[in-house]
């Protein structure tokens, strides 16, 4: 299996990976061959799930070549991987030069056996046997040679040869465009609807028998034998069924225009209807939340009608259809109207609340976007501006520093070995705060101006008597509760908007959101608070401090994202 050419790079493509294979798994395997520079598992941009292939880069090209020789087809977590040289030029990959197609392969032929058979004719860049979801061979595969000469030699020698008792076909690879467009779907069963009540099997057969042999006709009826207005006709040939659909669909039959089309399974119909619906309303349907309780359907339509023609406007209500849920939808006839409405209305005060207006999205898309944001932060290490208590350890909520110029400490997404205590807490201010279960925090020696600091009473700077640890803790807690109470009474939307930066707005909102989230999710309050502060506008964050029901929904969404990771 050795390759005899010098690689042009030290980058390898590793394919056919299971979704759960991570960079760490690959590093443990490939670093045994030589020093690995970096590894990247390619992931979906929305869901961040693995696309089942990766790139492994070595510092040394010889190490990469050795890894290709020794690790190709090695099982990784139970499934054989496929390794080839990384080819960054897409024109070379898609040109078809040197690419060979093999079919009628025995089910026992895998990547390695195919490689061993065809490597005699030249240097192979990639080799693959196509498999199904159960990892069973589909009976065909591809071999990509370095040169077209090697490919021609393989075709001449192996085409028609018996391999494992089966005569294989070997020929030049052709793209789907070269092979021609896929043939249209053939069918023999035709679905009819909008039939008159007096139309029975005999009348329908009389209409359709001119097109060809009919094997079966059924008109659906209720318990009393009354026609439901639809039925099926099954033909002997697909050509006859096709002619019926082309000629009879929309024609008047017994006083009504009938529908004739290919009979579909329920799952096909639902997928088609869903696609039609999503295409029709894409870019024109708006999602509005934080709606004042006094706003009804008519008022919502009136407010948004200035931007274009509205086809529907609805405020969602509870099961009793009496109380507004605080959100709704407005649908326009054109995307530019919807875009203008989003630009003008998002954040505008209607009634007593600022509206949140955005293009409507499916729940799975919203969740994927939130998950992507969270994953990107975890991966790149972007820090969030958050109060120092956004961890899961402290029982008490820490007040803001006395000096208004002091910036709140930043915090990374929680790593595996994180112990749940505040990150970067200024020394001398919260050093003696009690933590969960009433246990005092144990401080080891820390460097402060080059001097180690021991746990104990604070130094007497002002000439006053040192305050014992226990007494100082009590004072800190009392100050915490007093500060939180004062901040809560002073919180209003305008004061937050007037703050000079988004970081300061996040701090003000975070001080109120954190204890509310901590009530239901004490272990994850820090993470969830950070996710909300980063992904939501100020107006909506303020609303969450006032509406427990909306906050509970957001907490639930965040838990779903965290749970999937």
Swiss-Prot record:
CDD domains in the cross-refs = RRM1_I_PABPs, RRM2_I_PABPs, RRM3_I_PABPs, RRM4_I_PABPs
- UniProt-annotated stretches for the region Disordered: 435-466
Task: List the disulfide bonds in this chain.
Answer: none
**What range(s) does the RRM domain occupy?**
10-88, 98-175, 188-265, 284-362
Q: Where in the cell is it found?
A: Cytoplasm; Nucleus
Gene3D superfamilies xrefs = 3.30.70.330, c-terminal domain of poly(a) binding protein (1.10.1900.10)
Q: Which UniProt keywords apply?
A: Cytoplasm, mRNA processing, Nucleus, Repeat, RNA-binding
Might you name a Gene Ontology BP term for this protein? mRNA processing
What the entry lists under PANTHER family is as follows: RNA BINDING PROTEIN
Q: Which family does it belong to?
A: Belongs to the polyadenylate-binding protein type-1 family.
**Protein name from the UniProt record:** Polyadenylate-binding protein 1-A
Q: Source gene? A: pabpc1A
């Amino acid at each position: 299996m050795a390759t005899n050419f010098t690689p042009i790079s030290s980058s390898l493509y590793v394919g056919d990976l299971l979704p759960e294979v991570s960079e760490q798994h690959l590093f443990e395997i490939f670093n045994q061959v030589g020093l690995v520079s970096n590894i990247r598992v390619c992931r979906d941009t929305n869901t961040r799930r693995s696309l089942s292939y990766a790139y492994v880069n070595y510092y040394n090209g010889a190490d990469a070549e050795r890894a290709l020789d020794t690790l190709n087809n090695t099982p990784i977590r139970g499934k054989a991987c496929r390794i080839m040289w990384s080819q960054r030029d897409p024109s070379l990959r898609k040109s078809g030069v040197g690419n060979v197609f093999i079919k009628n392969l025995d089910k026992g032929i895998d990547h390695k056996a195919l490689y061993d058979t065809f490597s005699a004719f030249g240097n192979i860049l990639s080799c693959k046997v196509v498999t199904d979801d159960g990892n069973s061979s589909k009976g065909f595969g591809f071999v990509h040679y370095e040169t077209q000469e090697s490919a021609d030699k393989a075709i001449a020698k192996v085409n028609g040869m018996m391999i494992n008792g089966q005569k294989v076909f070997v020929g030049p690879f052709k793209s789907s465009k070269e092979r021609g467009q896929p043939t249209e779907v053939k069918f023999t069963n035709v679905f009819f609807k909008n039939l008159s009540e007096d139309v029975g099997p005999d009348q329908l057969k009389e209409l359709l028998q001119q097109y060809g042999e009919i094997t079966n006709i059924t008109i659906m009826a209720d318990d009393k034998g009354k026609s439901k207005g639809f039925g099926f006709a099954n033909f002997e040939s697909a050509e006859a069924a096709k002619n019926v659909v082309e000629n009879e669909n929309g024609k008047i039959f017994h006083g009504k225009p009938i529908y004739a089309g290919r009979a579909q399974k329920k799952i096909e119909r639902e997928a088609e209807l869903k696609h039609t619906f999503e295409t029709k309303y894409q870019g024109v349907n708006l999602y509005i939340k934080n709606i004042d309780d006094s706003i009804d359907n008519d008022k919502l339509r009136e407010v948004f009608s200035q931007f274009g023609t509205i086809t529907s406007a609805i405020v969602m209500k509870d099961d009793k259809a009496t109380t507004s849920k605080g959100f709704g939808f407005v649908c326009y006839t054109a995307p530019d109207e919807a875009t203008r409405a989003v630009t003008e209305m998002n954040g505008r005060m209607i009634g007593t609340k600022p509206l949140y207006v955005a293009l409507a999205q499916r729940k799975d898309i919203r969740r994927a976007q939130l998950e992507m944001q969270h994953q990107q932060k975890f991966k790149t290490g972007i820090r969030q501006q958050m109060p120092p208590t956004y961890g899961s350890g402290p029982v008490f909520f820490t007040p803001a520093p006395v000096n208004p110029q002091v910036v709140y400490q930043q915090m990374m997404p929680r790593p595996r070995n994180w112990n749940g205590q505040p990150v970067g807490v200024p020394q001398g201010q919260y050093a003696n705060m009690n933590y969960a279960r009433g246990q005092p925090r144990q401080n080891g020696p820390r460097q402060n101006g080059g001097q180690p600091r021991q746990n104990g009473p604070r130094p007497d700077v002002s000439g006053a008597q040192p305050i014992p640890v226990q007494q100082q803790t009590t004072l800190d807690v009392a100050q915490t509760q007093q500060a939180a109470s004062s901040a809560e009474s002073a919180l209003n939307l305008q004061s937050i908007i007037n703050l000079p930066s988004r970081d300061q707005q996040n701090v003000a909102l975070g001080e109120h959101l954190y204890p509310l989230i901590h009530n239901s999710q004490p272990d994850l309050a820090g993470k969830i608070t950070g996710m909300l502060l980063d992904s939501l506008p100020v107006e909506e964050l303020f609303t969450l401090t006032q509406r427990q029901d909306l906050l509970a929904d957001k907490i639930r969404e965040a838990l779903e994202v965290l749970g999937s990771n």
